[in-house]
């Protein structure tokens, strides 16, 4: 199986990290979640509805849509908060990345553990810029909103392609494809990881700083 890989880059101020990452992760999971499966008998099932809600950002001029699942939101906020704190405490240039990997399980014979086979990975490279004035922060608030809108549109375009998705499982195999542990939504199996690094390059950070300077010069 070929694993699809998508890479996004964002440049943000420190206080915007959490909102920007939640916007991206929630958007991807909105398109990679279904309602809960309700099996009547093997091979026959119904799918519940997936509720959505708008989220207005506090530090970015942006509104995104997420699945209205508090459990899913808490799970994402926990790992994004850890990423934010790691960036803040890195003492470096504020460079890091988060990866959202979708996978399915392949059962293995005892005593071996199940094999996790990735089929789609989203990587978001994050560059944190330091701003000196409130005027710069206001400009960054607007510019990041514009750039984030472009990223969300890109995500939706990718999701609309007719590419591989795991086939709908039978009742006995549903846990090999979906995370059934949430009460109100059923995302494809996923895991999130992050790393802090000083080797991601500075092209996006430089672009954001140039955008701010150009706007100030007007």
From Swiss-Prot:
Share what the entry says about its subunit structure, partners included.
Interacts with ATG13. Associates with a complex composed of ATG13, ULK1 and RB1CC1; the association with this complex requires the presence of ATG13.
Compartment(s) where it occurs, according to its Swiss-Prot or TrEMBL record: Cytoplasm; Preautophagosomal structure
Task: Spell out the molecular function terms from Gene Ontology.
Answer: identical protein binding; protein kinase binding; protein-containing complex binding
* Entry's Gene Ontology BP terms: autophagosome assembly; negative regulation of cell population proliferation; positive regulation of autophagy
UniProtKB keywords = Autophagy, Cytoplasm
Q: Where is this region: Important for interaction with ATG13?
A: 152-156
InterPro entries in the record = ATG101 (IPR012445)
**Name of the protein in question:** Autophagy-related protein 101
Q: Which PANTHER family match?
A: AUTOPHAGY-RELATED PROTEIN 101 (PTHR13292:SF0)
**Listed GO cellular component terms?**
Atg1/ULK1 kinase complex; phagophore assembly site
One Pfam match: ATG101
Which residues does UniProt call coiled coil? none
Which family does the UniProt entry place this protein in?
A: Belongs to the ATG101 family.
Question: Could you tell me what this protein does?
Answer: Autophagy factor required for autophagosome formation. Stabilizes ATG13, protecting it from proteasomal degradation.
């Amino acid at each position: 199986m070929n694993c699809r890989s998508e890479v996004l880059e964002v440049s943000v101020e420190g206080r915007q990290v959490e909102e920007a990452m939640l916007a991206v992760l929630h958007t991807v999971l909105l398109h990679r979640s279904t309602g809960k499966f309700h099996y009547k008998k093997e091979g026959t099932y119904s799918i519940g509805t997936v509720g959505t809600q708008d989220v207005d950002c506090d530090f970015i001029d942006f509104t995104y849509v997420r699945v209205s699942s508090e459990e899913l939101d808490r799970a994402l906020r926990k790992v994004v908060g850890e990423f934010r704190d790691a960036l803040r405490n890195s003492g470096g240039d504020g460079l890091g990345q988060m990866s959202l990997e979708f996978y399915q399980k392949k059962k293995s014979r005892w005593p071996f553990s199940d094999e996790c086979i990735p089929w789609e990975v989203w990587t978001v490279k994050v560059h944190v810029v330091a701003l000196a004035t409130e005027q710069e922060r206001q400009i960054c608030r607007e510019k990041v909103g514009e750039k984030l809108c472009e990223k969300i549109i890109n995500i939706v375009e990718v999701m609309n392609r007719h590419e591989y998705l795991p086939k709908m499982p039978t009742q006995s195999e549903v846990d090999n494809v979906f995370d059934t542990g949430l009460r109100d939504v059923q995302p494809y199996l996923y895991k999130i990881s992050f790393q802090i690094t000083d080797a991601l390059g500075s092209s996006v950070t430089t672009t954001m700083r140039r955008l701010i300077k150009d706007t100030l010069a007007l």
